[in-house]
From Swiss-Prot:
E.C. number(s) listed in UniProt: 3.1.-.-
One MF term in the entry's GO annotations: RNA endonuclease activity
Classification via Pfam families: CRISPR_Cas2
Complexes and interactors: Homodimer, forms a heterotetramer with a Cas1 homodimer.
Gene (UniProt): cas2
Official protein name in the record: CRISPR-associated endoribonuclease Cas2
Amino acid sequence: MQVIVVYDVPAKRTRIYRKLLRRRLEHLQYSVFFGELTAGQVTAMKNEIESELEPTDSIVVFEFDNPHAFDHTTFGDADEPGSRFT
């Protein structure tokens, strides 16, 4: 399944989530990650996120079983999602 994760956390905690998410996903922009994962990998990632979560953290995980179920448009100087490794 395709996964998009975005986070909004205090600056001192961004390193925690960036490191955690880069293990499985492509780092698209500052707090945006994208990739193709199995259901088991998504569950493991969510468990890791939950173990690091503090009350001031906000993380959203979008999951798409059908890659054609959503569309995207990229503006400016940005790589297409899925076009590079992290």
